[in-house]
């Protein structure tokens, strides 16, 4: 299976085009006001139209309420919901039933003990995203540029596709794929000049490095 590449936190037509033209399979839009990558509904509508038919559109939320989800789904028409908060299994099941969309649940990882909830999530989620656990005083759960010990996932047995994120860049994505055997990689801060400001060349370089990692993994 080919490696999926997701560029998350896109906010401008130029950086979105860079991701699409370089072959990203997924493009992520953040709907969380504390994040420097947050997009409003008007911008999301325009970016969604730009990405339509070229990549899967992913809506990232953090413990959003029903009204927020309804606005996002109506405006962006996402292909996948990414839940990055403390959403319960019951909440995830309700969202899937309500909107008829697949769900990717983010699981914050620092040690192997953080993998304990996986059994429950795997029963209801379509995909799992492993991200570095944020510090206790962080104002947002991801996009902080921190990595986690990828060796925690070495012995992982999961009957759902999974991706890795957290501090990925063109310099370390190959090592992350080699160790975790992940089916996809997700980057945000690793392709930015400053928080929330994506760089087109960094996006292209990351995708190029991910493709090289993919080739090595099948040799």
Curated annotation (Swiss-Prot):
Give coiled-coil spans as residue ranges. none
Known pathway? Amino-acid biosynthesis; L-tryptophan biosynthesis; L-tryptophan from chorismate: step 3/5
Q: Which GO terms label this protein's molecular function in UniProt?
A: phosphoribosylanthranilate isomerase activity
Task: Provide this UniProt record's keywords sorted from A to Z.
Answer: Amino-acid biosynthesis, Aromatic amino acid biosynthesis, Isomerase, Tryptophan biosynthesis
- CDD domains from the xrefs? PRAI
What does the record give as EC number?
A: 5.3.1.24
HAMAP family attached to this UniProt entry:
PRAI
What name goes with this protein? N-(5'-phosphoribosyl)anthranilate isomerase
One example of a Gene Ontology biological process annotation: L-tryptophan biosynthetic process
**What family is it from?**
Belongs to the TrpF family.
Pfam families in alphabetical order: PRAI (PF00697)
Q: Which gene encodes it?
A: trpF
- According to the entry, what is the taxonomic lineage of the organism? Bacteria, Pseudomonadati, Pseudomonadota, Alphaproteobacteria, Hyphomicrobiales
Top-tier EC class: isomerase
Keyword Cell wall biogenesis/degradation recorded: no
- Reaction catalysed by this enzyme: N-(5-phospho-beta-D-ribosyl)anthranilate = 1-(2-carboxyphenylamino)-1-deoxy-D-ribulose 5-phosphate
């Amino acid at each position: 299976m080919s490696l999926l590449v997701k560029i998350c936190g896109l906010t401008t037509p130029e950086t979105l085009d860079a991701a699409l033209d370089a072959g990203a399979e997924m493009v992520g839009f953040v709907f969380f006001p504390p994040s420097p990558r947050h997009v409003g509904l008007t911008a999301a509508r325009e970016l969604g139209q730009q990405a339509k038919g070229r990549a899967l559109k992913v809506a990232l939320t953090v413990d959003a309420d029903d009204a927020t989800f309804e606005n996002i789904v109506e405006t962006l028409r996402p292909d996948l919901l990414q839940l990055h908060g403390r959403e319960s299994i019951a909440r995830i099941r309700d969202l899937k039933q309500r909107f008829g969309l697949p769900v990717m649940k983010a699981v914050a990882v620092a040690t192997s003990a953080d993998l304990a909830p996986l059994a429950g999530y795997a029963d209801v989620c379509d995909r799992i995203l492993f991200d570095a656990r944020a510090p206790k005083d962080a104002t947002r759960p991801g996009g902080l540029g921190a990595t986690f010990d990828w060796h925690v996932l070495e012995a992982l047995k999961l009957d759902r596709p999974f991706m890795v994120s957290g501090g990925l860049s063109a310099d370390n994505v190959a090592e992350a794929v080699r160790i975790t055997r992940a089916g996809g990689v997700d980057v945000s801060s690793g392709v930015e000049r400053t928080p929330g400001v994506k760089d087109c060349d960094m996006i292209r370089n990351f995708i190029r490095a991910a493709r090289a990692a993919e080739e090595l993994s099948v040799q």
